[in-house]
Regions:
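Short, small-residue-biased leader/transition segments that mark boundaries at the very start
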Residues: 1-3
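Membrane-embedded transmembrane alpha-helical bundles that form the catalytic cores
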Residues: 5-490
Length: 491
């Protein structure tokens, strides 16, 4: 019975339990995967085929039969890029890239925005709209953007198209970043595909460090403070005092950072163990002294994608200051919409867009040049203001209803009751200990993290294994009754 249950868990899709990096089934399967991967070390094509098949299996365990969408996008964009590269007539080249945009954004709009657009249109016209039961495939926003970056780069003649469908399928479906990023650029990843497999001791050690730290951030810090504190506050903000609501906001800021950067760390670490390099996706974003700096540090793969393929296409900063500010707001409006088909995400994106435009205006007004860093007390206050603005925006990001966000702000500004703080810490001491640890680890100097990475690299193989097992044991001890999916799975 146990073996049949295990086989069922391995081969069937359970929408209530999608496969994620922090699940026990993935950790065991990954060990088996690595063994086969190493056996195919010198057989490049067989290894690429094996990884691609495993990636499709991984996506099947996340979204069921909707893995065919991944195949559809892959096949369409592979042949579109090949045909576009051969075409010399400009308008025909443009027609091919428009077709790629239509296919990818069409799929994205149907699965993600049909109900949102229908409800919005109905409310504007006074009509009625019956919500359709449309399943949102996990990570569709990520793999469509990744595939689009390839066809757009081919259109711009920045890269040459691949000649192997297998290589392109490997690029689009590579499982470490498939369902929640980072969004990997073709120009960075494709040159690595056919390289001889080589994992240096430094790559292996850094990979282990990133997997361990990512697992700790996600499964220990993020999940625990979410289930035991943050969700309670956001679900019923009017039941709690202002100080409790504020601590809930600080908790959510840490939760979403640890959740998303934890996934990115694990993705980058797993890729390193397989011999591939991804660019960093988070760079201590809450250390930012301005909102512009924040977006250079937060979800770097998305912000750089929006910059290169949307902001610059709109004209960037080449059409005058007013146009630049408008382009920033439009880009962040669409960036907010990318996160979800809901007005709270749109509002969140607009707030960040207006803040970015205001910061650019301030830089122009004061004559400060791009890249100029503040220091000392100026930087301290810059970090403080930026962090609290980001936290303010997280309130609207987290709450689906605008009224709930206003209730939370009302509690913070009218019933603060700071005298309750010692009692709050005493009642939730485990949560506050983890929050303190999480923020401490975030704000330590970068040199400390580099030193920790070097320490893990120098550990013998047995030491690395003990470290992994210790963190896995800690995760098991602290896990909630249900596996908490990564927040960005829904995007």
């Amino acid at each position: 019975v146990c073996s049949s249950d295990l086989l069922r868990d391995v081969f069937t899709y359970d929408p209530q339990a999608p496969m994620i990096f922090s699940s026990g089934i993935f950790l065991w399967l990954f060990v088996a995967f690595i063994l086969v991967y190493l056996l195919l070390q010198r057989r490049t094509t067989a290894r690429l085929l094996f990884v691609t098949l495993f990636s499709y299996y991984f996506y099947y365990k996340s979204s069921g039969t909707y893995f065919f969408l991944l195949g559809l996008v892959t096949v369409c964009d592979f042949f579109i890029a090949r045909l576009m590269a051969r075409e010399a007539i400009p308008w025909l080249r443009k027609a091919w890239v428009v077709l790629s945009l239509f296919i990818n954004l069409g799929l994205l709009c149907y699965f993600k925005y049909t109900n949102f657009l229908g409800e919005t249109f109905a409310s504007l016209t006074g009509g009625t709209f019956t919500t359709m039961d449309i399943f949102l495939p996990v990570g569709i926003s990520f793999f469509t953007f990744q595939s689009l970056s390839y066809t757009i780069d081919v259109y711009r003649r920045q890269i040459t198209p691949l000649t192997s469908l297998l290589d392109y399928a490997f690029y689009v479906s590579f499982f470490p970043q498939l369902v929640a990023g980072p969004i990997v650029r073709a120009r960075d990843f494709i040159p690595q595909i056919r390289r001889p497999l080589f994992v240096s001791n430094e790559m292996f050690g850094r990979g282990i460090f990133l997997i361990v730290s990512g697992l700790f951030k996600k499964a220990v810090i993020s999940d625990y403070i979410s289930v035991n504190f943050v969700e309670r506050i956001f679900d019923n903000p009017t039941l709690y005092s202002g100080v409790e609501n504020l601590m809930g906001v600080y908790g959510y800021a840490l939760q979403i950072y640890c959740d998303f950067s934890g996934y990115s760390d694990m993705a980058i670490g797993i890729a390193l163990l397989l011999g591939f390099h991804f660019n960093i996706n988070f760079d201590s974003p809450y250390k930012s002294a301005s909102i512009t700096e924040f977006w250079r540090r937060w979800h770097i793969s998305l912000s750089s994608w929006l910059r290169d393929y949307l902001y610059i296409s709109l004209g960037g900063n080449r059409k005058g200051k007013i146009r630049q500010y408008a382009n920033l707001i439009i880009t962040m409006f669409l960036g907010g919409l990318w996160h979800g088909a809901s007005w709270n995400f749109v509002l969140w994106g607009m707030m960040h867009g207006v803040a970015l435009a205001a910061h650019k205006f301030w830089m122009t007004l004061t004559g400060r040049k791009k890249g100029t860093e503040s220091h000392g007390i100026h930087r301290f206050f810059g970090v403080l203001v930026t962090f609290h603005f980001v936290c303010f925006c997280w309130i609207f990001f987290r709450n689906a209803e605008f009224s709930t966000s206003m209730d939370m702000l009302k509690q913070i500004f009218t019933t603060f009751r700071p005298q309750l703080f010692p009692q709050l810490v005493e009642g939730y001491w485990e949560v506050f200990a983890l929050m303190a640890l999480g923020y401490l680890l975030h704000f330590v100097p970068d040199s400390w993290e580099r030193a920790c990475t070097k320490t893990v690299i120098r550990l013998p193989l047995l030491g690395k294994a003990v470290l992994m097992l210790a963190v896995i044991y800690l995760v098991i001890q602290m896990k909630s009754s249900e596996i908490q999916p990564f927040i960005y799975f829904q995007f």
